[in-house]
Amino acid sequence: AYLLGYELFTSAKFPPTQKMQTLVEINNMIFKCGVGEILDVNLGYRKKAKEKDILKVHRYKTASYTTEGPLVVGAKLAGAKKGLVQKLRLFSKPLGVAFQIQDDILGLFGDERETGKPVGSDLRQGKQTLLILHALQNGSSKDR
């Protein structure tokens, strides 16, 4: 799929400079997502995750490909100036984190028919999410 995507992209009718800048961004997005996956797997081996570590995973793994990458790639292909690209980058990271938090909420309380994801799967897999972290830190002994 990646190779086909690259092939389609390189044959698209954009100026060569824009293509190169965009390919660099796409490669960075893939790299960040990979780093996020490594961080996420590493969190799975820890007994207790810290909020800052979970948020770092969200920024690298989720925000890079759901919000930051697509917005920046689109802006670069549209010929946006560096200042706008930087503003989009800054805007998109917290948006991607919010997306992941919402996904985690739906994973615990959503309707499987709507989400396509089994309710409680993160909990059963021992995944350390912000919701679970805060429930363990702030919940009563009964809630934990």
State the predicted function of each range.
Residues A1-S141:
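Mg2+-dependent prenyl diphosphate-binding active-site environment of isoprenoid biosynthetic enzymes
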